[in-house]
């Protein structure tokens, strides 16, 4: 416990809240252009080829974003919408691409959890 004299000398520092998605600049989503689409392998206990894209955002940042769902149509120069949200087993991937908007089509033949993958209700 500090003395009053110590508190007068240098006051308590407020705790800074750091954002987990700095490239979005406080916006819920950002538009960007894919510069590279490739696969990466996850961290230790897991094994897969996760689809990711390098995206240049309108805020000027170059980020790595995860492409959710089975199958995608993204390639270089595709315009995508990016939201926050990390992928736990991919280090450095702190963003998700929003399916069903701009150039990213929804997941084909998706029946459940459709809203998360940009799929319309089947007739």
Curated annotation (Swiss-Prot):
Cell compartments where the protein resides: Plastid, Chloroplast
GO biological process: translation
Origin: domain of life: Eukaryota
UniProt GO molecular function: rRNA binding; structural constituent of ribosome
Record keywords: Chloroplast, Plastid, Ribonucleoprotein, Ribosomal protein, RNA-binding, rRNA-binding
SUPFAM superfamilies noted in UniProt: Nucleic acid-binding proteins (SSF50249)
Xref: InterPro entries: NA-bd_OB-fold, Ribosomal_uS12, Ribosomal_uS12_bac
A Gene Ontology cellular-component term: chloroplast
Pfam families with a match to the protein in the record: Ribosom_S12_S23
UniProt function note: With S4 and S5 plays an important role in translational accuracy. Located at the interface of the 30S and 50S subunits.
Complex formation: Part of the 30S ribosomal subunit.
Protein name listed in UniProt: Small ribosomal subunit protein uS12c
Organism this protein belongs to: Physcomitrium patens
Gene designation: rps12
